[in-house]
Regions:
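Polar/acidic, low-complexity leader/linker segments enriched in S/T/G and N/D
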Residues: 1-12
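Helix-rich interaction surfaces within compact, conserved domain-sized segments
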Residues: 6, 83-133
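Short, solvent-exposed beta-alpha or beta-beta edge segments that form flexible loop/patches at the rim
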Residues: 17-51
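Short glycine-rich, low-complexity/disordered patches
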Residues: 21-28, 78-92
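Short, charged/polar surface micro-motifs in flexible loops or helix N-caps
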Residues: 32-33, 57-59
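Oligomerization/assembly interface segments of phage tail-like spikes and tubes
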Residues: 46-56, 108-110
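A broadly used, surface-exposed interaction patch
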Residues: 59-88
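Short, cationic low-complexity segments
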Residues: 77-80, 126-142
């Protein structure tokens, strides 16, 4: 699943604690579903909860959440755009170990589309990127 690979790389590169302690980051897929229809090709969509576990986190929790939020904006923008999804699709829990350290769990409800394209009687399977965020393309006229 490409989004989990992307998310791990983004967290590793943007969160100082994870740059120094990549072994403390775990990613799990939970409640996975395959959504498909009776279309002519076997295209489908993954729906799953990504569970991000960070053990013994001693960094700034606000930085961690801001980095995840930035990744979501680029890779699953419907969570920020939809009021219902904002309430349900980005959750966290923490076990406070002491005044400076916690185990943190972040849950993200994600989707990934996979297209099956029939070329000369054979299917070519490819993951599709998220649609462009319309607010990133916003232009004003004067």
């Amino acid at each position: 699943m490409k989004k989990l690979t992307s998310l791990r790389g983004y967290l590793d590169s943007k969160v100082p604690f994870l740059k120094d302690n990549p072994e403390n980051l775990y990613l799990f897929v939970e409640n996975g579903r395959i959504i498909s229809t009776l279309e002519e090709t076997p295209s489908f969509e993954y729906e799953y909860t990504a569970n991000i576990i960070i053990e013994h986190y001693s960094g700034d929790q606000n930085v961690l959440i801001a980095v995840v939020n930035d990744w979501l904006r680029k890779n699953q923008s419907d969570i920020s755009a939809n009021p219902t999804k904002r309430q349900q699709d980005f959750k966290f829990e923490a076990v406070i170990l002491d005044n400076t350290t916690a185990h943190i769990s972040i849950e993200l409800n994600l989707t990934e589309r996979v297209l099956a394209i029939n070329k000369d009687g054979k299917y070519v399977i490819e993951a599709t990127p998220e649609p462009v965020n319309p607010f990133d393309e916003w232009q004003t006229t004067q």
